[in-house]
Amino acid sequence: MLYGAAAVNQKDSKLSVAEQLFAHAKPDDYMGNEGCADCHAETVAAFAQSPHAAYVSDPKLPLEKRGCEGCHGPGYVHRADANPQVISFTKMTPQESAAACLRCHAQTMSPTHWRRSAHSQAGLSCVSCHQIHPDVPNDLQSPLAQKADARKPAFIARKNPSTSMLKADELTLCGSCHASRVNEFRKVTHHPVPEGRMLCTDCHNAHPTKGLQLTQDSNKQMCVTCHVEKSGPFAYEHEPVAGNMGGDGCLVCHSPHGSNNPLLLNSFSRGLCGQCHVDKLSNHHPGLTCWSAGCHVAPHGSNTDPRFLAP
């Protein structure tokens, strides 16, 4: 029997390549890792040391989710067919590659959510960031993986847990695409990601379930996870902090990755407040900032004064 694209009928037309291959497989088509090692001994041995292997070696798993064949498809079909059918993650489209991973990782996100995500729409797949086989030869890696591997660590960044199976530390890996954000961490004030006290994923969700949204939560809710004292509730709330300005929240005033101004501010002058309070710039007391002069000292909110003045 032919597998893959050659075996697709009308009923199978909406299935991914991986789903088609497993849908047609019979129990006798699976041979176990030992059969794979006949040709791929080094790869099988390296994979046995990976966190992934500890899970897929569970004998309680169904055949189609066990060992090498759990990802690459039934082994006897690959060995016997004149046109060998196998799931090769470096030769599939990003959508097909992600669909193969999501057969087991559906709890991370659904295929529908993945297709709508920013990473998917940028042409990435799971193996763009995750290395399933330890020490995969460079010529078998995706172009993005080669780019990440070739890049020296941007900073002394915190190592991710080995169970994440990332190709590099988060700052280096994310920076291989988001270089402009990495450069912001070189500014005078920045969140302590380069120092290893934070990770990109402390704020960003690499597996988003809200379309193009890559932050863990709304801007305000995400920030107050750490900056609890700024969250209120206050008797008199400042509109940006209250989240009433189109969802920008804290970002109306702060630049989260890095800034050359104190306190991660977008500007350290009266012009910061003047973005919204234009009418106050010409007829107010002079001063470098509206708060350092000792007037509006509670910009996040106040329980005593609606103009956020000092008590």
Question: What is each stretch, according to the model?
Answer:
Residues 2-311:
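Short sequence/structural segments immediately N-terminal
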